[in-house]
Amino acid sequence: MVKIPCIYENGQIEDIEASESVFGRVYNEALVHQVVKSYLANARAGTRAQKGRSDVTGSTRKQWRQKGTGRARTGAATNPLWRGGGKIFPNKPTENFKQKLNRKMYRAGMCTIFSELLRNNKLVAIDEFQIEMPKTKVCLQKLKNYQLENVMIITSEIDSNLYLASRNLPNLKVVEVDLIDPVSLLAYDNVVITRDTVNKIENVLQ
């Protein structure tokens, strides 16, 4: 078992026990790289598109006769060599960016990230994170009480007060356990989990 420091709003700190298979793994840089790369690739919409000569709007009439003008021969105004013409070999939304990653590897990668965050003192637990009213200043004051900046908070449930109070803060992200992702875990300076989510994270990743 490993121990995660749990901070109370009054400043008191105690250690809570957590599974070593989730929060005590050896760091595997190659696995984390593969998990992050796969997540970013699968998030791509794949909708970029460029217009070829058959897609652009323009006349398909031959611009001048083939011979006798002294100018280079030409055809339609949609010719890629002309200004306003189509693009040679245009990108089409037929590319498949999906990168398959086994569930076992993904979970192992997430466990590795949590373990490394804990080793670097970037992962802490708090007793709870409840907001009494949907006010941003109330949420900001609560963060100051815990001395937290640029933080991602993982909670078991986001009520309407917490959602409304936190959505306008640029350096705060509040997510439920089922919606955590590797990129967000690595993007913030601190990751905070509520006390009741420790077991839920273990159940999801084991």
Curated annotation (Swiss-Prot):
One of its GO terms (molecular function) is rRNA binding. One of its GO terms (biological process) is translation. Residues 47-77 are annotated as: Disordered. Keywords: Ribonucleoprotein, Ribosomal protein, RNA-binding, rRNA-binding. One of its GO terms (cellular component) is ribosome. Part of the 50S ribosomal subunit. Belongs to the universal ribosomal protein uL4 family. One of the primary rRNA binding proteins, this protein initially binds near the 5'-end of the 23S rRNA. It is important during the early stages of 50S assembly. It makes multiple contacts with different domains of the 23S rRNA in the assembled 50S subunit and ribosome. This is Large ribosomal subunit protein uL4. It comes from Nitrosomonas europaea (strain ATCC 19718 / CIP 103999 / KCTC 2705 / NBRC 14298). The lineage of its organism: Bacteria, Pseudomonadati, Pseudomonadota, Betaproteobacteria, Nitrosomonadales.
